[in-house]
Design a protein with these regions (language model features):
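Glycine- and acidic-residue-biased ligand/ion/polar-headgroup-sensing regions
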Residues: 28-40
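Conserved GNAT-family N-acetyltransferase fold
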Residues: 11, 33, 57
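Short beta-strand His + acidic residue motifs that chelate non-heme Fe in jelly-roll/DSBH
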Residues: 21, 42-43, 59, 65-71
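Double-stranded beta-helix
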Residues: 7, 66-92
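A generic "binding-loop/recognition-motif" signal
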Residues: 28, 47, 63-64, 73
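Short acidic-glycine-tyrosine-enriched beta hairpin
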Residues: 46-61
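A short glycine-rich, His/Asp/Glu-containing loop-to-beta-strand
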Residues: 1-23, 29-30, 80
Length: 92
């Protein structure tokens, strides 16, 4: 669901996949990730954080991030941004 006051959705990653080809950040918007099914790695400012099922991460503005499925099972993650600002995203 995108806009106007919230942006959220479900990310499905196959084994070995990443959320994006390159890490990215947001100038103004916080983003929350909830690892619903499977396990993976949350990458924040080039640091790797294990993310087993049930993990929650709050990514603040200007924190560079990505997600990788390093398991052998599908990874399902919910993302939530409090405001829909597609122009706020930048790649690194």
């Amino acid at each position: 669901m995108r806009g106007p006051s919230i942006d959220w959705g479900i990310i499905l990653l196959k084994p070995g996949e990443t959320m994006a080809d390159v890490d990215h950040g947001h100038h103004e918007v916080d983003e929350t990730f909830y690892f619903v099914e499977g396990s993976g790695v949350m990458i924040v400012n080039e640091k790797l954080h294990n993310a087993p099922q049930g993990s929650v991460f709050l990514i603040e503005p200007n924190e560079i991030h990505n997600i990788k499925n390093n398991s052998e099972d599908q990874l399902k993650v919910i993302f939530i941004k409090g405001e829909y600002k597609p122009e706020d995203k930048y790649e690194c």
